[in-house]
């Protein structure tokens, strides 16, 4: 049984569970969030930033 524990420990050290991509990290999800920010009423299309006050729902920089 201890050999199995050692093998499991070695496998987890070589391939940690944090190396697996999460659903929120997918490029498709990031593009969808970016599109939502561009449709935000405070988003300035020309300057590509959010007008002040910058809400949390806007994913871009604040214009200032």
UniProtKB/Swiss-Prot annotation:
<feature type="disulfide bond">
    <location>
        <begin position="49"/>
        <end position="58"/>
    </location>
</feature>
<feature type="disulfide bond">
    <location>
        <begin position="50"/>
        <end position="62"/>
    </location>
</feature>
<dbReference type="GO" id="GO:0005576">
    <property type="term" value="C:extracellular region"/>
</dbReference>
<keyword id="KW-1015">Disulfide bond</keyword>
<dbReference type="Pfam" id="PF02950">
    <property type="entry name" value="Conotoxin"/>
</dbReference>
<keyword id="KW-0964">Secreted</keyword>
<feature type="signal peptide">
    <location>
        <begin position="1"/>
        <end position="19"/>
    </location>
</feature>
<dbReference type="GO" id="GO:0090729">
    <property type="term" value="F:toxin activity"/>
</dbReference>
<protein>
    <recommendedName>
        <fullName>Conotoxin Tx3.5-a</fullName>
    </recommendedName>
</protein>
<keyword id="KW-0027">Amidation</keyword>
<keyword id="KW-0165">Cleavage on pair of basic residues</keyword>
<keyword id="KW-0800">Toxin</keyword>
<feature type="modified residue" description="Cysteine amide">
    <location>
        <position position="63"/>
    </location>
</feature>
<comment type="similarity">
    <text>Belongs to the conotoxin M superfamily.</text>
</comment>
<feature type="disulfide bond">
    <location>
        <begin position="54"/>
        <end position="63"/>
    </location>
</feature>
<dbReference type="GO" id="GO:0008200">
    <property type="term" value="F:ion channel inhibitor activity"/>
</dbReference>
<dbReference type="InterPro" id="IPR004214">
    <property type="entry name" value="Conotoxin"/>
</dbReference>
<feature type="propeptide">
    <location>
        <begin position="20"/>
        <end position="47"/>
    </location>
</feature>
<keyword id="KW-0732">Signal</keyword>
């Amino acid at each position: 049984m201890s050999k199995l524990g050692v093998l499991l420990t070695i496998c987890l050290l070589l391939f940690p569970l944090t190396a697996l991509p999460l659903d929120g990290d997918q490029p498709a999800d990031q593009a969808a969030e970016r599109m939502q920010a561009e449709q935000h009423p405070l988003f300035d299309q020309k300057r590509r930033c959010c007008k002040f006050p910058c809400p949390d729902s806007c994913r871009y920089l604040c214009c200032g």
